[in-house]
């Protein structure tokens, strides 16, 4: 029989000791008497590298320290400690309308399995900044991924009762294993009890009978090993351990903390020094009687909510357990000294050297031997511990409880006779002179805003637009007024009235918007796939399919580099291609270099992205009977010409958009499309949508004041109930803006760990939060801060990752496979035709799989794990490979990097103000509202103000604007609609007392 502590952390986790490495873990395992130790943190690449360097294989699936890494010590075991690969992952996500924060422990049989699982998880989120990574992934999805990579893995929900971060936790947990894991619940065989509960408590919950209830230390430093551990009566091997945990055969019981010593045993509010029993919490309505804030509901209270059995119930076949205290604490409690002091440490080492490891001393060593080595007081302390005769002061709200072995009087009277103490009940913490009648009033909770029925019933203006019979209809739709709904409803009603789907076309501004439109139409009408839906470029490419070959990005860069070299131009290929695009969109001038590039592109038999519009204009006979154009304010001159051509003389044209959101002049957008249309088609019917469903009145008021300086009247009316004030945080620097945002996000999700959890009335998931900025540079500052804080995020980019060789080569390979196109670039990337054929044979059967799955397997096959490839994987949220490849060719900034709501992993979204167009989030941080940055000095002020307006109107409920240095002039224009705050208040100085 041996002791196993399977849940610990390394020095790569937050709030851990610097000595949490293998040599010190091995040393302390010997001192504690633990034979099997989890490595912890297997997801962290630096830790895995250390494990590979300091460990060597032992029994099947287990490792031991290499001799050269071993530290000498006073205490030895008959068998040197073994290590098993383990790690803890924090899952923060939304399920069933509630934010869930669940920690899970995973055991693996090898370093290779750890490497493979870590690789898979790195395509989902950031696993490098913390040994216990935070993923916006459900526990069920994490379990599925784990078993998919390693079927022999053991998956254990961690410290299941902890209030803020566990499967059954009071604030974010579930009521059953099935509720958490769904149809994968049968794969859960063991649950971890946590320090604040013990088997006696857990036996009261009948549904736990079928699980192996394990106990581990969750140690953040080697000296904390073995606070709780498991007794295993089975051979030393991973298969035997797995069997013991999954079947209970060979699982002999646990060594336990006194649950009262755990820091979440009782209820309470630490800031008000208030500890409550579950009954008292109910008496006060769950609110602190001192300050009125929510009380942290402890483990005992939560367990009682799910318990069906009385206290002291012992089911048949229950495993034995023992309550223990760490030996240094026993020494300190017996002598009245500090457990971390020199005297306690000297006695501890002396006892180990003379009597053996700690677990043996506490459980088995004759008390006479203890008395000879350490004195009568320590022997008596151990006697009382073994008998369970201890004094308990329970922990609450993150504050550890205290277990005493002697009364203060006994400690003072060191020479007096020692007597056994009766069990002392937990003292109830009665709030002084407070009762429910005179307690502070509970915080008032607002009634939830009534759900609008805009998803099912149109308002009067929306209905008028959907039913319009005019040959040309122009709809002015401000933000949040149901633009996409109105457009979808109109198309659906046309089909219901007998219009053939093949005669209908809907042009969107982004691939993502086209995807959303298709999904809505599929849910609304039959034969929706027959309706033409796409961006200008994707529709043009479809019309020209078979007539034109679209140049891969690598070919464009190659031709650009050749022209730059030949003409001695002083610019990078990427910048040159930007100039070419501007020229083709009517925003730039031609040059000899640009003309030569276009000639070479034609000679290669290819066209680029911007050629598609011009080529489509040559097909004069192509028209649509019912043409719909979304985001009409953003079309450029050639696209406008194409709209008029596609509508023809007999077709019906329906355009919708918001002139206040015209922000793409740099791409050729003319900005006056609505005015031009009304001049060209004076018979057009103009309809205005004015009821805004997206924002609170506070956000909408700020937005209207921001855009007001551009002139004109706007009649937007908020439908939502009032919400939080718009905040303006003034920071000392750009870096402090990033730090402020990271800390605020951590607060909004209720804290990232048990050291910094928040006390929010309403919690958000990471996926409900966005960070927007004018430039990628500002976003990179914020991103660094988020990643250092361990917050998962989808990073913004200027698209440069698409030019990385491993990315362009990957897209070329799958483009050749999926479309049967030219394979020359892919062959070059793979190193020849033979390598291409091998890869083709392996991946052709996978072409129908989801793009994320394909890219994950391709990354393993090609050993690709670069940041650029990870960005490609982040963007692979499409339903099938052709759609994904088209998006990579056609998509804008937001399409590639912000996959909307389709990702299974929740992450904070980072986007430029341009890239965020069309998105909306419950919470938005708008960063870098500084002079010369928003707006830039050379920019058109009116368009930059529209861009600021777009940023503000991405926020549904909460908007936080940050600034540093000299503020943007736009901030003066919204004065009165924002609540200012100093993100770094100056320290308050006071005279220190001499005493």
Regions found by a protein language model. Name each.
Residues 451-467, 471-475, 481, 485-486, ...:
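Accessory N-terminal region flanking or inserted into the helicase ATPase core
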Residues 474-491, 682-685, 692-791, 818:
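Helicase P-loop NTPase motor core
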Residues 783-785, 804, 811-981:
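Conserved helicase C-terminal RecA-like lobe
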């Amino acid at each position: 029989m041996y002791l196993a502590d399977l849940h610990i952390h390394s020095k790569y986790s937050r709030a851990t000791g610097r000595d949490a490495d293998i040599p010190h873990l091995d040393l302390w395992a010997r001192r504690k008497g633990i034979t099997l130790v989890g490595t912890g943190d297997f997801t962290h690449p630096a830790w895995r590298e250390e494990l590979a360097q300091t460990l060597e294989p032992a029994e099947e699936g287990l490792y031991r320290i290499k001799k050269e890494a071993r530290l000498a010590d006073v205490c030895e075991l008959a068998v040197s400690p073994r290590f098993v690969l383990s790690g803890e992952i924090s899952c923060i996500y939304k399920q069933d309308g509630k934010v869930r924060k669940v920690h899970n422990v995973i055991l693996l049989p090898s370093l290779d399995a750890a490497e493979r699982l870590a690789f898979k998880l790195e395509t989902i989120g950031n696993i490098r900044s913390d040994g216990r990574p935070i993923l916006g992934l459900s526990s069920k999805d994490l379990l599925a991924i784990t078993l998919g990579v390693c079927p022999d893995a053991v998956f254990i929900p961690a410290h299941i009762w902890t209030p803020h971060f566990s499967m059954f936790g009071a604030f974010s947990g579930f009521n059953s294993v099935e509720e958490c894991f769904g149809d994968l619940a049968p794969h859960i065989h063991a649950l971890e009890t946590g320090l604040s509960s013990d088997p006696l408590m857990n036996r009261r919950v009948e549904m736990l009978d079928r699980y192996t209830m394990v106990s581990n230390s969750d140690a953040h430093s080697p000296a904390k090993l073995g606070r709780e551990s498991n007794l295993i009566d089975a051979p030393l091997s991973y298969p035997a351990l797995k069997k013991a945990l999954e079947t209970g055969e060979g699982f002999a019981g646990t060594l336990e903390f006194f649950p009262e010593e755990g820091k979440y045993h009782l209820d309470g509010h630490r800031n008000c020094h208030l500890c409550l029993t579950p009954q008292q919490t109910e008496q006060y309505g769950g609110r602190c009687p001192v300050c009125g804030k929510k009380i942290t509901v402890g483990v005992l209270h939560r367990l009682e909510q799910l318990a069906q059995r009385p206290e002291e119930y012992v089911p048949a076949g229950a495993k034995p357990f023992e309550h223990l205290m760490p030996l240094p604490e026993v020494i300190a409690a017996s002598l009245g000294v500090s457990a971390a002091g020199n005297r306690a440490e000297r006695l501890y080492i002396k006892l180990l050297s003379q009597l053996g490891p700690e677990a043996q001393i506490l459980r088995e060593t004759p008390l006479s031997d203890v008395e000879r080595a350490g004195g009568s007081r320590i022997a008596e302390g151990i006697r009382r511990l073994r008998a369970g005769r201890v004094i308990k002061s329970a922990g609450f709200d993150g504050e550890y409880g205290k277990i005493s072995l002697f009364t203060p009087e006994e400690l003072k009277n060191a020479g007096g006779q020692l007597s056994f103490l009766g069990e002392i009940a937990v003292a109830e913490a009665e709030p002084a002179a407070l009762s429910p009648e005179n307690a502070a009033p509970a915080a008032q909770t607002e009634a939830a805003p009534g759900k609008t029925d805009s998803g099912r019933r149109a308002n009067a203006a929306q209905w008028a637009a959907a039913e319009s019979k005019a040959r040309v209809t122009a709809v002015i739709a401000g933000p949040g007024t149901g633009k996409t709904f109105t457009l979808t409803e109109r198309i659906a009603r046309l089909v219901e009235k007998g219009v053939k789907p093949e005669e209908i076309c809907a042009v969107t501004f982004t691939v993502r918007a086209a995807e959303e439109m298709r999904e809505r139409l599929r849910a609304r009408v039959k034969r929706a796939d027959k309706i033409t839906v796409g961006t200008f470029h994707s529709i043009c490419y479809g019309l020209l399919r078979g007539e034109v070959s679209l140049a891969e990005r690598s070919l464009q860069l190659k031709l650009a580099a050749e022209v730059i070299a030949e003409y001695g131009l002083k610019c990078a290929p990427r910048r040159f291609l930007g100039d070419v695009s501007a020229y083709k969109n009517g925003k730039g001038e031609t040059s000899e270099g640009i003309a030569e590039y276009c000639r070479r592109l034609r000679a290669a038999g290819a066209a680029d992205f911007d050629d598609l519009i011009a080529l489509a204009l040559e097909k004069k006979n192509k028209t649509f009977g019912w043409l719909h154009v979304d985001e009409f304010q953003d079309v450029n001159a050639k696209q406008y010409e194409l709209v008029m051509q596609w509508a023809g003389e007999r077709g019906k044209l329906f355009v919708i958009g918001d002139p206040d959101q015209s922000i793409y002049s740099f791409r050729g957008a003319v900005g006056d499309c609505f005015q031009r249309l009304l001049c060209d088609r004076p018979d057009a019917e103009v309809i205005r949508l004015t009821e805004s469903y997206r924002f609170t009145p506070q956000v909408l008021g700020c937005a209207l004041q921001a855009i007001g300086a551009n002139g004109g009247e706007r009649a937007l009316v908020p439908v939502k109930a009032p919400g939080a004030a718009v905040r303006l945080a003034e920071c000392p620097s750009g870096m402090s803006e990033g730090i402020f945002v990271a800390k605020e996000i951590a607060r909004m999700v209720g804290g990232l760990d048990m050291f910094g959890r928040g006390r929010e009335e309403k919690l958000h998931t990471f996926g409900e939060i966005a960070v927007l900025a004018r430039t990628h540079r500002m976003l990179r500052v914020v991103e660094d801060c988020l990643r250092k804080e361990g917050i998962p995020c989808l990073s913004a980019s200027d698209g440069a990752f698409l030019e990385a060789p491993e990315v362009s080569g990957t897209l070329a390979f799958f483009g050749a496979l999926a479309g049967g196109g030219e394979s020359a670039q892919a062959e070059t990337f793979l190193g020849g035709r033979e390598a291409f054929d091998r890869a083709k044979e392996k991946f052709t059967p996978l072409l129908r799989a989801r793009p994320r799955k394909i890219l994950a397997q391709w990354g393993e096959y090609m050993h690709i794990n670069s940041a650029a490839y990870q960005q490609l994987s982040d963007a692979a949220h499409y339903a099938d490979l052709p759609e994904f490849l088209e998006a990579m060719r056609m998509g804008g900034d937001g399409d590639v990097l912000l996959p909307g709501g389709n990702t299974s992993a929740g992450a904070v979204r980072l986007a430029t103000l341009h890239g965020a167009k069309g998105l909306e989030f419950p919470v938005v941080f708008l960063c870098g509202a500084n002079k010369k940055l928003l707006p830039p000095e050379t920019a058109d002020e009116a368009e930059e103000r529209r861009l600021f307006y777009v940023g503000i109107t991405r926020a549904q409920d909460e908007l936080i604007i940050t600034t540093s240095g000299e503020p943007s002039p736009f901030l003066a224009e919204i004065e009165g609609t924002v609540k200012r705050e100093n993100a770094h208040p100056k320290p308050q100085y006071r005279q220190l007392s001499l005493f």
